[in-house]
Amino acid sequence: MRPSLAELSVDDLASVLAQWGYKRSHAGRVLREYYARCGELTEAGRPWPAGLLERLRIEFAPGGTALAARQVAADGTTKLLLRLADGRTVEAVLMPDYRADRAAGCLSSQVGCAMGCDFCATAQSGFERNLTAGEMVEQFLALRREAASAGRKLQTVVFMGMGEPLLNLDAVLTAVRRIADNTYGGLGWRQVTVSTVGLVPGIDALTAADLGINLAVSLHAPDDATRAALLPAGRRFAIADILAAVDRFQASRGRPVIIQYCLLKGVNDSAAHARMLAAVIGSRRMHVNLLHYNPTGLSLRGVRYEPSGDEAAAQFLAELRARGVVTHLRRSRGPDIDAACGQLRAKRGELSVQS
């Protein structure tokens, strides 16, 4: 099987080119073109050295990831089912921005997920394997290509799809570098967000990497007991320890950290829960995203969760804002095609090809 250019660094490719008798300096141009043209190499632009493109096309696959299916929601959100070289599948999502020429992308970091969050569809599929950096890059390129076909620019990406990014941190960081750095994808560091359920060692490792990216933490409860029932990771790391790790990240980064909070009817959505959350956050510079729960059927524990009503969600929002917490109530993107938060499962039988 031919390797993918998405798996290579500039130094990796430079060594290959040198073995072929080409200048090492061509490697940077090859990869810049590859990323700018969404995973393709063409004759456009200034001439290439004789035979180089032909040799690259022979030795390297455009990518090991293929589009298996595509589905478009009523709100314009597009979900891609991508088949990996080993036959496994993952999902990536493109979300149109309110600006007509922009879009955001959601990337997966693993096939399945081992975190077992009780209200998440991905958890019900279990964990199969980590994605390579190149497989994550190929998701990015697929979404960039999808955005371009719709006349949009892929402006930001979030690692919030299938999997826990901090359990695949080395590959995720490599993918982030390839996506953000001008040598490769050129998206920009501040345009990348990595999400976690709150794995303290992983947050500290992300801090040590010092990449200038954004951090989002899926909290989903203001107290340890409620959180432990919803997220098994809550039994390993107390909220106080998670926020201490977030403080260390923020001290080196200087930008607000995002707190993700999925509102579940009768579970974590009362005014008292909101006041507890505000107290936990205190004076920290955080932005809370309140998420509408997207039903996934019975949970791992056999619970049928329901989304909070509009009145409860509005009251929760008001309680936080009244206490000085920057808060937004996010609308679901693509729930009608199971593309919204917590709905990704990568089942081919549930996704049909649409044009």
Curated annotation (Swiss-Prot):
Binding site for S-adenosyl-L-methionine: 163-164, 195, 218-220, 294
Compartments (UniProt record): Cytoplasm
EC numbers, comma separated: 2.1.1.192
GO term, biological process aspect, one: tRNA methylation
Catalyzed chemical reaction(s): adenosine(2503) in 23S rRNA + 2 reduced [2Fe-2S]-[ferredoxin] + 2 S-adenosyl-L-methionine = 2-methyladenosine(2503) in 23S rRNA + 5'-deoxyadenosine + L-methionine + 2 oxidized [2Fe-2S]-[ferredoxin] + S-adenosyl-L-homocysteine; adenosine(37) in tRNA + 2 reduced [2Fe-2S]-[ferredoxin] + 2 S-adenosyl-L-methionine = 2-methyladenosine(37) in tRNA + 5'-deoxyadenosine + L-methionine + 2 oxidized [2Fe-2S]-[ferredoxin] + S-adenosyl-L-homocysteine
Enzyme class, first EC level, given as a word: transferase
GO MF assignments: 4 iron, 4 sulfur cluster binding; metal ion binding; rRNA (adenine(2503)-C2-)-methyltransferase activity; rRNA binding; tRNA (adenine(37)-C2)-methyltransferase activity; tRNA binding
Residue pairs linked by disulfide bridges in the UniProt entry: 106-341
GO cellular component: cytoplasm
Gene3D superfamilies registered for this protein in UniProt: Aldolase class I
NCBIfam families reported for this sequence: rRNA_mod_RlmN (TIGR00048)
Family listed: Belongs to the radical SAM superfamily. RlmN family.
Protein name: Probable dual-specificity RNA methyltransferase RlmN 1
Organism from which the protein derives: Opitutus terrae (strain DSM 11246 / JCM 15787 / PB90-1)
Upper taxonomic lineage: Bacteria, Pseudomonadati, Verrucomicrobiota, Opitutia, Opitutales
Name of the gene encoding the protein in the UniProt record: rlmN1
